[in-house]
Every structure is written in C-alpha cells, then in structure tokens.
C-alpha cells in the first residue's frame, strides 16, 4: 500500500528509486552502489578519526612533463631503440606520459585535504613544474638521486617505483600517488595508517584470474600476476585481487625487505627502459601484499571514482562529484586515468574540469 501511495504521489521519484534499486549506479572498484557510499564512509571516517597518530607521514608523487623538449629528445631516442615485441602494450604510448597539469590539482588536493602530511616528494627526470617553488615541505627528487645511472634514463614506472624507498629523509610511513589521483574530501591520517603503524590495503573487487581469462594484456596485470606468483611460492598465500586505482599507503621497511629477499627478481627488470610483461610492480602490488603477509597492513575501504580522462564520460563523473560535493557525500578519492592516445575522445578537457572542481585548492 505504501508503494502504491508513493507511486501516485511522486511517480518520478518512485520510478527513480525502483531503477536505482534494481540497477544501482556504481562508479568505484569496490562495487559499492552510489546511494550506499555515504553510509559506509561516514562510519569508516568516524572510526578512523578516533585515535590520534603521532608518527610522520609523507607523500610521494611520480611525475613527468612530456612537453619538455630535452625529455622528449631522450624519450624519442630510446623509443626508437626498443623492440616492439619486447615492450608491453601501450608502454611507449604518448598518453602514458601526457601532462595535463594534473599534478597541480593532485598536489593541491593533498595540501587542502591532508594538512597533517609532513612532507611531499615529487620524483622526476631532471624536471620541475614551472608553477612550483620547491620548499622544505615540497621537495623535488631526481631519478639520479634514487636510481643507479646504468638504468637511466628510464621511462618505466615499475623501475621508478621500485626505488621510492631510497628517497633521502623519507618517512617510514608514506603514501604513494600517481598524479592522476585526487583526494576528494578531508581525510584523517587514520584512513591510511592505524595508530600502531599498520597500513591500509585498499583492495579492489576485481579478480586477476578473471582479467587474465578475459584476455586482458597489460604490463600492470602481468606484473601483478608475477608478483602474486612469487609471494604464493614463498608464503603459500594466493592473491587474486589488485588494489583500487588510488593512493597507496606504504612502509619503507617493507620496501627494504623486498630488496633483501628478492634482489635478483628486482634487478631482472631494471634495465627495461619501458614497461614490459616481465616486470614487478612493487609500489602498487608487491609491497602492499607483502605488508599484509607480514601483518603490517589490513584490508581497508577506499571509495574511488575511476574513469577514463579521454572519454566523454569524464564530464559525467565530474558532474557526479559536483552533486556529491553539494550533498556532502563525496567519495574518498577519484582517478582520471589517461588510458591511451588511440582511444577516440570528445576532448573532455580534463584540465578544465579539474580547474572547476578544485577552484580553491590549486597550489603554485
């Protein structure tokens, strides 16, 4: 009877609610319906804020400016030298290195929404954002500071990420960001680390086995499968879930342990100038899962909107974020990923969309 009354009183709302229940809108990788996100986040954030954290937490970005002529020359020279059959899918695609000024907004989101961060490191290849003035809070780290020169220059994110623990003065607890990941709302340090130092493991609902069965062929999947195989062989622990495409809480000591235990495996791919299907992805899979095996990470929830920056759908996601902002129901984060330059695009202009969304969070 109540449903009948609702239908006659507000037929539009009745139909909307019926469709949302039967076909829920899902914008994240943990497969949480949009209308349930806020319930989970409110309770999670309340719990994560209860116990203060008294240790320093840093943030690390990796970044490249593909408009830099000197960098472009190095990139083109080495791109011509690689064997196309040896590198992974899209490994040399220009989209992997495209700079839409995302770092400006990602960094701004960290400064605005994570004010408790001690220091921010930006790992680059002889570059510095034109709009940024480095300081004690925000430091530029060159590839030569952390990677042996015999492996440089490198255009392989897996190689760069394998050396993050060598950043001078880096805290034991740090959060790794790609520059296409953005904090969407204020978050406590407890979202990333417990007060006893345990890291959050932001698991996705995706399955490595299913992705492989469907024929997915990317360096990321190959690196995850290889990492999972090594960990399963040594610890009899089967891992089938990648992480959500968002920031990654990490422990420097687990990086160092990875190098002690698996130096030969790690050194085997350091000479790969571009990503291949024979790499390991330390920062985004191997170290987080080894942390879990060692008891210093626990599965946690991060609701991250993940979308293709080149797709016309990007505007739809930003509209959803704006609506959520007005309602106070924003997700934890979002990732505007630049998939590949061969995809058709309606020129969603991600820079314009970011500038509108982060009107008051830009740094420079």
UniProtKB/Swiss-Prot annotation:
EC numbers, comma separated: 2.7.-.-
Function recorded in the entry: Part of a group II capsule biosynthesis locus.
Class in the EC hierarchy, top level: transferase
BP GO terms, sorted: polysaccharide biosynthetic process
Top-level taxon of origin: Bacteria
Name of the protein in its database record: Capsular polysaccharide phosphotransferase LcbA
GO molecular function: transferase activity, transferring phosphorus-containing groups
Originating species: Aeromonas hydrophila
InterPro entries, per the entry: Stealth, Stealth_CR1, Stealth_CR2
Family: Belongs to the stealth family.
Gene this chain is encoded by: lcbA
Keywords: Exopolysaccharide synthesis, Transferase
């Amino acid at each position: 009877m109540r449903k009948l009354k609702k239908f006659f009183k507000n037929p539009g709302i009745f139909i909307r609610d019926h469709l949302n229940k039967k076909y829920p809108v899902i914008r994240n990788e943990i497969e949480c319906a949009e209308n349930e996100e806020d319930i989970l986040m409110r309770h999670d954030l309340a719990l994560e804020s209860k116990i203060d954290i008294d240790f320093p937490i840093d943030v690390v970005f990796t970044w490249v400016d593909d408009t830099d002529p000197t960098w472009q020359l190095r990139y083109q020279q080495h791109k011509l030298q690689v064997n196309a059959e040896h590198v992974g899918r899209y490994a040399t695609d220009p989209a992997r290195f495209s700079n839409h000024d995302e770092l400006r907004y990602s960094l701004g989101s960290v400064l605005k929404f994570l004010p408790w961060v001690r220091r921010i490191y930006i790992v680059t290849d002889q570059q510095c954002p034109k709009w940024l003035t480095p300081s004690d809070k925000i430091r530029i780290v060159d590839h030569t500071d952390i990677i042996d020169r015999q492996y440089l220059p490198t255009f392989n994110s897996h190689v760069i990420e394998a050396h993050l623990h060598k950043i001078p003065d880096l805290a034991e607890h740090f959060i790794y960001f790609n520059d296409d990941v953005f904090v969407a709302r204020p978050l406590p340090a407890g979202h990333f680390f417990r007060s006893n130092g345990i890291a959050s493991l932001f698991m996705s609902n995706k399955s490595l086995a299913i992705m492989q069965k469907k024929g997915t062929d990317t360096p990321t999947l190959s690196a995850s499968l290889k990492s999972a195989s090594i960990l399963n062989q040594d610890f009899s622990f089967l891992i089938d879930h990648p992480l959500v495409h968002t920031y990654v809480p990490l422990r420097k000591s687990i990086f160092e342990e990875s190098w002690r235990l698996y130096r030969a495996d790690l050194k085997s791919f350091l000479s790969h100038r571009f990503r291949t299907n024979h790499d390991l992805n330390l920062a985004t899979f191997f170290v987080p899962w080894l942390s879990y095996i060692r008891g210093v990470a626990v599965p946690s929830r991060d609701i991250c909107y993940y979308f293709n920056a080149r797709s016309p759908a990007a505007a739809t996601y930003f509209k959803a974020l704006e609506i959520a902002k007005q309602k106070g129901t924003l997700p934890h984060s979002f990732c505007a990923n630049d998939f590949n330059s061969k995809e058709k695009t309606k020129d969603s202009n991600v820079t314009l969309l970011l500038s509108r969304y982060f009107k008051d969070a830009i740094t420079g």
